[in-house]
């Protein structure tokens, strides 16, 4: 594993901010309107997800950046960036989401429905989240991350 950049507090803060806000909003909408969870179950799930999202935000950013670099080597096109964002989101978030739902007492059918729905919707969510994360990184003035850069300079360790 080669070091591509040092740990950067701005980067970690931007990744954490983006993950907590985006996951709370999209997760609640999916849980209540798609999987049939009650508002109370969803609120419990979203509340539990906050510390989890704080813990996984930076590792997700590292994973996403790795997939973006890998995808960019295959094709520098914008569709590859979108595909890389989608794949990163689905692969990283689905197991975490299933564990959160299990911990708050969702039934097996609810978990399967929520995770499957989230995986399908993640095609769009992963791309939207990638754009949101990019915007948060610019807002937090992450070093090496600027508006013109569609593929960020590595800020994390390469996987």
Swiss-Prot record:
The keyword Zinc does not apply. It is a multi-pass membrane protein. Its main location: membrane. InterPro entries: Ala_export_AlaE. It is found in: Cell inner membrane. One of its GO terms (biological process) is amino acid export across plasma membrane. GO terms for molecular function: L-amino acid efflux transmembrane transporter activity. Keywords: Amino-acid transport, Cell inner membrane, Cell membrane, Membrane, Transmembrane, Transmembrane helix, Transport. The keyword Transmembrane applies. The chain crosses the membrane at residues 17-37, 48-68, 86-106, 110-130. GO terms for cellular component: plasma membrane. Exports L-alanine. Belongs to the AlaE exporter family. This is L-alanine exporter AlaE. The gene is alaE.
């Amino acid at each position: 594993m080669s070091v591509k950049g040092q740990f950067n507090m701005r980067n970690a803060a931007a990744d954490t901010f983006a993950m907590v806000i985006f996951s709370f909003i999209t997760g609640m909408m999916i849980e209540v309107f798609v999987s049939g969870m009650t508002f109370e179950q969803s609120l419990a799930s979203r509340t539990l997800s906050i510390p989890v999202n704080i813990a996984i935000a930076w590792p997700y950013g590292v994973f996403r950046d790795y997939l973006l670099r890998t995808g960019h080597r295959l094709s520098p096109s914008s569709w590859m960036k979108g595909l890389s964002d989608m794949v990163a989101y689905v692969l990283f978030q689905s197991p975490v989401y299933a564990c959160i739902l299990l911990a708050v007492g969702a039934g097996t059918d609810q978990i399967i429905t929520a995770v499957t729905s989230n995986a399908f919707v993640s095609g769009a969510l992963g791309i939207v989240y990638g754009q949101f994360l990019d915007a948060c990184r610019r807002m937090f003035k992450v070093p090496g991350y600027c508006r013109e850069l569609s593929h960020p300079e590595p800020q994390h360790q390469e996987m």
